[in-house]
Each structure stands twice: as C-alpha cells, then as structure tokens.
C-alpha cells in the first residue's frame, strides 16, 4: 500500500503497440512527442530540428508529408536520426504508402479521408510490411460530414463515434497496431471526448489539445487538459501543441509528467516566487540552474527557497536543498539533512556540483 495514496495515479491498462523501438501503452512509460515545423523537403533543416527535439527528451517526432517529395525525403532523413519518425498524412493514400516504405515507424492518418476500402487496404498492407503502426487522428475541425450533420456541431459523442468508425475500418482489415486521438482546441470538449473514448476502447490513447495557441496560452491549456486526463489514468503518449519552437513542446510535456510523478526524468526544481524576505536572488538562481542542470537525466529533486519560512520544510523533502539565511549565509541540505552554510555567490557552483554528484551516485545503483 502506498504511503501517500493521495498521490497515486492508477493508469488504465491499454494494449501495447510499437512505434519503432518505443512501446506505447500498457505499463510502458508515457511517451512525449513533438512535430517539426520545417519544410520536410528541406532535408538538412528537418534533420537538425528532429535531433534538437530528440536531444530535449522526445521519444517520438512527427513530420508532415503533404506531397510525394516530402514522403520520399523520409528515406534520407531517417538515416540521420535515432528517434522513431511519425509521418503526418492527410487525404492522399499514396503518401502514406510512400512514408511507410521510406522509414516512417508510424502513420498519423484518418482512415475516413484516405479513400475507399481498396486504398485503405493498400495503406495497411504497406504498414504491415514495414512494421509501421498507425495513429487514428480524429479532430473536431475535420469530422466526417454525416457525423457533423447528425450532431449539428463537434461534441464528445461525435468525436467518439468518428473514432469508433475508424477503429472498425482497421479491425475489419485485421490491423490492430494502432493508437487513437480525439483532439479539439476546446479543453472541455477534449477532456469529455477522451474520457468517453477510454470507457469503450483499450487501444492506447494519444493525448493532445490541438491548436492550443502560443507558448503561454498553449502551455496553460495543455497542462489543464492533459493534466486532468493523466490524473484520471488516461493517456499513453502526449503532444503539447504550441505556436512556438517544437523543442519547447518537449520541455512542457516532460514537466507535466514530472509534476504528476508519471515519468521522472531530470531534475525537478521546487522554488519559491521570491519576496522581500529572500536572502539571495531566487529567480536568477533558478534560471541559471535550469540551464546548467539540463544535461542531468537522472530523476532527483532540488529545492531553492529564499528564506526560512518554508525553506527547511521543503529541503527536508528533496534530495538537495538551499534555504536562504541572514547575511548571505544560506543553508545547504543533502538528503533532507542540514549540511553546511553556503555564501550566496557560491550557490550556483555548489548546487551544480552536489546535483552532479548525487546523479552519479544514483546512476551507479541502477
């Protein structure tokens, strides 16, 4: 039994699928993905952005393939990246076949707009022959005409009906290596649709709030929407959609999972907003430490608190902690225990040193 049951999240057990060497669903870690915003035909720019996204901690990267030149470019792109590539396909079934044959490990499609049964059969055959999974991507902005006419507007029931229709299309062709998403730019609609879908299927679910907005608004909307679902135990892979640098999507995605203890990777920093009581410059210190500790992948906790009101209590619950003290004499905590005083000007170097040392110790135990 958990010592802190109020923190427990019981994930729904879903089927397991493979996207390259990444397993999605079941007890596997919730994966984080992003999407390139380069022209896929600009092969060098796309390779660079994929590698930047991967370096930030992405498990998967999606690439748009709007034309033949883009889907064929995957053959060269996949030679120079080590993260599984998902090809984003709309309307033209040949693009999906080309992507599967040229290195994509997953196809993001909506079977309902790919074409007739013969075309869908050809796409699924290419996917099977190339060990390529599929994501059924239902979106409130592109629902089937008859479903929209039935429900009058996008609603949770409409998204779920579209998903179930597309699930049947794949199952009827004996294809089961797929995940599903039911996205909307509306948080309430998205949450309700995913909750309904989770009740009627055990295929893995890809979570996202589509067209969420810029960095601030998009991060907030995604955190509320995805956070609510993840706390319900729903979701096997996530994407934060931002009108910004795709690398930032990975930062936010990993922070959401880290905050919910669903995937601990890297240093989790607990810090105060600072006030007149701070004994050192908390905000500047945190910004510098976030940058200097970005290379640490070992999960551990660090508290940076500017005064003694909450500092000792927070430090007692983290691996490493700094609590502000009078006259620049701040207290360093190691494993929740007071260690020694540290001058304000030495905080950065000392904390970095202690974090790296602690990470090395933990790595040896793994």
UniProtKB/Swiss-Prot annotation:
Named cofactor requirement(s): [4Fe-4S] cluster
Lineage: superkingdom: Bacteria
Coiled coil location: none
Catalytic activity from the UniProt record: (2E)-4-hydroxy-3-methylbut-2-enyl diphosphate + oxidized [flavodoxin] + H2O + 2 H(+) = 2-C-methyl-D-erythritol 2,4-cyclic diphosphate + reduced [flavodoxin]
Keyword Iron-sulfur set for record: yes
Any Pfam family hit: GcpE
E.C. no: 1.17.7.3
Pathways per UniProt: Isoprenoid biosynthesis; isopentenyl diphosphate biosynthesis via DXP pathway; isopentenyl diphosphate from 1-deoxy-D-xylulose 5-phosphate: step 5/6
Residues the record lists as binding [4Fe-4S] cluster: 272, 275, 307, 314
Gene3D superfamilies documented for this protein: Dihydropteroate synthase-like, Sulfite Reductase Hemoprotein, domain 1
InterPro entries found in the cross-reference section: Dihydropteroate_synth-like_sf (IPR011005), IspG_bac (IPR016425), IspG_bac-typ (IPR004588), NO2/SO3_Rdtase_4Fe4S_sf (IPR045854)
Sequence similarity: Belongs to the IspG family.
Chain's role: Converts 2C-methyl-D-erythritol 2,4-cyclodiphosphate (ME-2,4cPP) into 1-hydroxy-2-methyl-2-(E)-butenyl 4-diphosphate.
Protein name: 4-hydroxy-3-methylbut-2-en-1-yl diphosphate synthase (flavodoxin)
Organism, as annotated: Pelagibacter ubique (strain HTCC1062)
Gene: ispG
């Amino acid at each position: 039994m958990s010592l802190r049951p109020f923190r427990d999240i019981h994930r729904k057990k879903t089927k397991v699928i493979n996207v390259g060497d990444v397993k999605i669903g079941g007890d596997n870690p919730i994966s984080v993905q992003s999407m390139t915003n380069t022209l896929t035909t600009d092969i060098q720019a796309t390779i660079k952005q994929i590698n930047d996204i991967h370096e930030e901690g992405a498990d998967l990267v999606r690439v748009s393939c709007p034309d033949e030149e883009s889907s064929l470019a995957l053959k060269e792109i996949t030679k120079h990246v080590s993260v599984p590539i998902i090809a984003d396909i709309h309307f033209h079934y040949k693009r999906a076949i080309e992507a599967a044959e040229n290195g994509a490990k997953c196809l993001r499609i909506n079977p309902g707009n790919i074409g007739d049964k013969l075309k869908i059969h050809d796409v699924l055959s290419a996917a099977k022959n190339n060990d390529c999974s599929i994501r059924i991507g239902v979106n409130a902005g592109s629902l089937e005409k008859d479903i929209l006419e039935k429900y009058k507007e996008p609603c949770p029931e409409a998204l779920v009906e579209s998903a179930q229709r597309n699930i049947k299309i794949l199952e009827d062709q004996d294809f089961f290596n797929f995940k599903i998403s039911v996205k909307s730019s509306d948080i309430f609609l998205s949450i309700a649709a995913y909750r309904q879908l989770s009740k009627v299927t055990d295929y893995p679910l890809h979570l996202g709030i589509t067209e969420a907005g810029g960095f601030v608004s998009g991060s907030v909307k995604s955190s509320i929407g995805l956070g609510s679902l993840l706390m319900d135990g729903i979701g096997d892979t996530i994407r934060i959609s931002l009108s910004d640098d795709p690398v930032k999507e990975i930062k936010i995605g990993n922070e959401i999972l880290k905050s919910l203890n669903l995937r601990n990777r890297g240093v989790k920093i607990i810090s105060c907003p600072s006030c007149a009581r701070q004994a050192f410059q908390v905000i500047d210190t945190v910004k510098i430490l976030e940058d200097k500790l970005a290379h640490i992948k070992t999960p551990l906790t660090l508290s940076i608190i500017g005064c003694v009101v909450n500092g000792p209590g927070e430090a007692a619950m983290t691996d490493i902690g700094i609590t502000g003290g009078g006259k620049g004499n701040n207290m360093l905590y190691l494993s929740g225990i007071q260690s020694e005083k540290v001058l304000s000007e030495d905080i950065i170097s000392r904390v970095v040193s202690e974090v790296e040392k602690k990470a090395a110790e933990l790595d040896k135990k793994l």
